[in-house]
Amino acid sequence: MPEPITLAEAHPADLPAFRKNLQEAFALAVIEEFGPLQDGPIPSDEDLDSAFAAPGAEVLHILRDGEQVGGAVVTINTTTKQNALDLFFISPAAHGQGLGHRAWTAIEQRYPDTRVWHTHTPYFEKRNIHFYVNKCGFKITAFYNARHADPNRPGTQDFPGVDEAFEFEKVMPGATATI
């Protein structure tokens, strides 16, 4: 039987290590697709600080048997119940063990009142697209590119390839989407 996956809120003192671990996980796909990072870590420290401090944001450690194996930043809107998975990662050393899906299930269970989940990923991140669509049940709702810019991320160019991205949503059972 696999070890249990649990979630724990990150404390302010945890954020520097959380940031570093997230940036290491995100860098893998960018380096694989575009080569070495030229302009510092991705996402940038400033973007992560903004995500951590955003209204409704919750920073979560993903734990396997009490050991940190990843993290997530979610934005919870208790009024509309339309929530966002802003950032999600599994530590590279723990890839390929089914932890991502189990962690996502734990997030869904932590927020049972959610009507709709929203998330996004760069176009080149085929592994993420497969994960969200085929493993977690998200649907692609938009493809942002030079001819159809993302209205929620104007001018964001943190790293190569981010100018083309998919937006996803998952309508939870018993809910209807109202966008």
Give each language-model segment a name.
Residues 61, 67-76, 84, 89:
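Conserved beta-strand in the GNAT
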Residues 120-121, 134-161:
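Conserved catalytic-core motifs of GNAT/GCN5-like acyltransferases
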Residues 5-20:
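A short beta-loop-alpha structural element at the N-terminal edge
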Residues 44-61, 70:
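A short helix-loop-beta-strand connector motif used in the catalytic cores of GNAT acetyltransferases and
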Residues 81-92, 120-121:
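Conserved acetyl-CoA binding element of GNAT-fold acetyltransferases
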Residues 90, 96-109, 134:
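Conserved acetyl-CoA-binding loop-helix of GNAT-fold acetyltransferases
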Residues 26-49:
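Conserved GNAT-fold acetyl-CoA-binding loop/helix
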Residues 110-123:
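Conserved GNAT acetyl-CoA-binding A-motif
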